[in-house]
Amino acid sequence: MINSNWSVLPVGNEKSAFKLLFFVLGLSLLCRPAMPQDGNCEKRLLPVVVTDKDGNRVTTLTSADFRLDNREVGTNVLSWNADLRRHRVVILLDVSGSMHGLPGSHLWNVVMALVQHVASVESDNSEFALALFTDRVLETVDFAQGRDALKKRLDEISRDPTFPRIGKGHDTKIYDVLREGVHMLENPTSADSLLVITDGFDEGSKTRPDEVLGQLAGPMIRVFAVLVDPLPGERSRPDTGEFVRFVQKSGGQVFGPVDAGNAAFRDSAKSAQAGQVMAGQLGQFYRGILENNVLTIQVSAIQKPQAVRLSLTDSARHQLKKPQIFFPREIGTCLSTDTSR
């Protein structure tokens, strides 16, 4: 067990509130030996997260609690286990102008506090890389450079007044960038994830969401998102519904949206309580990325990506009361990983 207490020091008047928040945002992750990567096309490892009505991750299920109804894919659920493989996470940080928020707000400080907190998650079973993007990937810190290099670059960005980048419009192309992000994962597997920190507003990507989902389907890479709200209360704010649905179809989850007025990020009497609430929520979110379970399923020979129809049995649903289940909604052929540029 690793116990970590982190203190992130953003720039601005909220420094003391941020310090308080990230002192309580400690996350303990199990140190677990690595498992072999996916290598058998007949037996596929489907990453699954089940939560109860309060959003807490459920780990007490067995393979008998799941029902897989797919004639095209197969119907055999072989086992349900903790995912002991090494988890690689590519953090995709949106640095486009909209991440600045409303005039006078401190949204960018919130963004940097969140991404620095993510980068500080400690586990012997995880690796992190970073990509900064607007309408394209601007720069990267890859896995080989290590966690220290990643955290150092984030610290530099937090102090650099040229961030976020102010563009000329149509400067946030999330789906184009996600396609590039997959290429940072050499020999990807279903233990790998993309974590996007963004406002969720795509502007003119040439790549369609379903094209990205098709690219993810072979290795079953999941996409997670930390959403921030740059225009809280504004009627003209764009709809993020399409992006949220995309994340969920990939098998991932969404945290937020968080805005600059969130009590956890303000220097007020309510900061401590709000920080504790956010600590618990972030802890569950991270565990969905790094401590998921896997269903080993027997897969028939498939020639193209197929929908996955997975559900809990009636008895399991009754026992858990309003559970939610997160898993990749599409499974591709072994040859559909498409790591070529």
Where are these regions (language model features)?
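N-terminal secretory signal peptides that target proteins for export/translocation
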Residues: 1-17
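Bacterial N-terminal signal peptides
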Residues: 19-30
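Acidic, polar low-complexity linker/tail segments
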Residues: 38-90, 95-104
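C-terminal "exit" segments of structured domains
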Residues: 39-44, 260-341
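DG-centered beta-turn motif at the end of beta-strands
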Residues: 66, 94, 130-133, 181, ...
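Von Willebrand factor
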Residues: 84-191, 193-197, 203, 227-239
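VWA/integrin I-like adhesion module and closely mimicked acidic/polar interface patches used
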Residues: 200-249
